[in-house]
Swiss-Prot record:
A cellular-component GO term for this protein: glutamyl-tRNA(Gln) amidotransferase complex
Enzyme Commission designation: 6.3.5.-
Additional note from the record: This protein may be expected to contain an N-terminal transit peptide but none has been predicted.
Comp. bias (Polar residues): 78-93
Similarity comment: Belongs to the GatC family.
Cell location: Mitochondrion
Protein name as catalogued: Glutamyl-tRNA(Gln) amidotransferase subunit C, mitochondrial
GO BP annotations listed: glutaminyl-tRNAGln biosynthesis via transamidation; mitochondrial translation; regulation of translational fidelity; response to differentiation-inducing factor 1
SUPFAM superfamilies: Glu-tRNAGln amidotransferase C subunit
Organism, as annotated: Dictyostelium discoideum (Social amoeba)
Keyword terms of this UniProt record: ATP-binding, Ligase, Mitochondrion, Nucleotide-binding, Protein biosynthesis
MF-aspect GO terms: ATP binding; glutaminyl-tRNA synthase (glutamine-hydrolyzing) activity
Amino acid sequence: MLSIPEDKVEQYCDDLGGFLNSVESIQSVNTENVRPLHSILEDTQLTLHFEQTTVNQDHEHILDHSNNVQGGFFTVPKQISSHTNSQKSNKNNSIDDEF
């Protein structure tokens, strides 16, 4: 069961009503003489090429392609997230505080 804050119920109902109206509008389209489309590329000739993987042991050469390297690894920006009830109960599982 979903838990919706009381002050958000009206907004959620409006949003859901909008989604349902959109679905109803789509379902009302006459598709009687429309051929089913299995892929957007079904009428396009695809040129296949041979792909080959290689093992690259030159770790430093790979890291040279980035400005964000520290200690021999790529670095990424810290992710800041809002704390929800599940995050508060799992404080030990949060890696955000480690970096």
